């Protein structure tokens, strides 16, 4: 079976971290001594041809978190690139499934069962064609809404009662498949780059304050 290699930019750490960063990294190592209590699942398709596509919003959010915190996320486990991190004061398994979008649930279900993590502690960041470009929507449960990645996660968790952070990519003017695997324009990417931190903030808020608080703060 083909085992994908992690993208090279995810395997490298920034040079010369500051003293404050070193202290924070030590704290994060201490926090990571226990098993993860949450999954943060960032959806996308692996491969360079998908890097700037609408379906890869989740991967973009993960990469933003990796870059901001000087992290690694290159351990291939549960058919996903993974790393246990401190996020929202909890031990969280960051996941970038490498199954392709439509089989994302295989990776998520396997990790959730292994760590005995309940569905309401599985947070998924994904694209949403029903939302205008750059608009966020936090939901605590619900149908897949035509998103095959979410549909597969629902099937493998056996429930739709898991929180998700949806990032709008706009409605297609043509075939949906071509739209979601199509690249952002330069102007669209600027909008998306501006919303990734908010998507991560919404996910963190779910952990610290609950879904309702995240909805009140980030939906709109």
Stretches with model-predicted labels:
Residues 16-22:
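Short alpha-helix boundary/capping segments
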Residues 23-140, 150-155, 159-165, 172-175, ...:
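Nucleotide and nucleotide-moiety/phosphate-recognizing core
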Residues 137-143, 181-185:
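Short glycine-enriched, charge-decorated loop/helix-capping segments at active-site entrances
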């Amino acid at each position: 079976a083909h085992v994908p290699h992690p993208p090279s930019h995810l395997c490298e750490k920034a040079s010369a971290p500051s003293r404050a960063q070193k202290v924070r990294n030590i704290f994060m190592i201490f926090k990571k001594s226990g098993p993860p209590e949450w999954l943060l699942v960032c959806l996308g398709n692996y491969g360079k041809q998908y890097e700037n596509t609408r379906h890869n919003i989740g991967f973009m959010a993960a990469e933003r978190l990796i870059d901001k915190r000087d992290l690694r996320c290159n351990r291939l486990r549960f058919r996903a690139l993974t790393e246990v991190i401190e996020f929202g004061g909890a031990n969280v398994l960051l996941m970038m499934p490498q199954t392709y979008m439509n089989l994302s649930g295989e990776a998520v279900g396997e990790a959730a069962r292994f760590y005995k993590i309940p569905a309401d502690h599985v947070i998924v960041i994904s694209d949403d064609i029903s939302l205008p470009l750059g608009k966020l929507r936090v939901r605590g449960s619900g149908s897949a809404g035509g998103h095959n990645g979410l549909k597969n996660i629902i099937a493998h968790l056996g429930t739709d009662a898991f929180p998700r952070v949806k990032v709008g990519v706009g409605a297609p003017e043509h075939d949906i498949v071509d739209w979601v695997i199509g690249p952002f324009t330069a102007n669209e990417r600027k909008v998306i780059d501006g919303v990734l931190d908010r998507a991560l903030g919404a996910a963190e808020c779910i952990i610290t304050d609950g879904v309702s608080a995240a909805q009140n703060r980030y939906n709109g």
